[in-house]
Amino acid sequence: AKTIPSLISRVGHIRVFAAFASVASIVVLLHSIIISPLTWFILRVITGFSMVCLYTIAESWLNDRASNKNRGSVLSIYMIVLYSSMALGMFFLNFSKPENFQPFILVSLFMSLSLIPILLTKKKAPRFKTISGMTIKELFEASPMGMVSAALCGISHSAMFSLIAVYAASMNFSIFEISFVTFLI
């Protein structure tokens, strides 16, 4: 996350968003070409970093556009749309066999589609003052419980979102049932 502000200050929100959406789109396609657990691990790390960048840019842009009066509503709607999209996206598993390359193309397509509203906007990108960041040590010293809690929540959510489908498959659920279980989570 410390890399993002310096990138934004150099080339702007729109270009950084476009760059990381493109990286995420490319990396998703690479999953269908290279079938290797180690490679997929590396690709997932790259995807995760790209998604952090995309979320940071989108949320900072929304935060800049919202007033103090409507910020909570704007960010609430954003989160509802975000989580609803992720939940409904699970049903795309039913359109193709998971071992085929089509799901990867579909995800890449949606990543590429995310660029259109940002690249075609007439609105100016937000301009933020450069703020000083915190080192991980400073963050831990300021809020040890907060940092540990955030890390544990991140790990547990990642495990749950990543492994619930694997667990459902091991219980011999159909693809529809797996997508429904992941939808509910």
Predicted regions and their residues:
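Structural signature of the two symmetry-related core transmembrane helices
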Residues: R15-L29, S108
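Helix-breaking motifs and short loop linkers at transmembrane-helix boundaries and internal kinks
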Residues: I33-I35
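Helix-to-loop junctions at the C-terminal end of transmembrane segments
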Residues: K2-H13, K97
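Paired small-residue
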Residues: L38-I46
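C-terminal membrane-cytosol helix-exit motif in multi-pass small-molecule transporters
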Residues: S108-F128
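Pair of pore-lining "gating" transmembrane helices in MFS-fold secondary transporters
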Residues: V45, F140-A159
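Cytoplasmic helix-loop-helix junction between adjacent transmembrane helices
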Residues: V45-I80
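Short amphipathic helix-loop junctions that connect adjacent transmembrane helices
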Residues: S162-E177
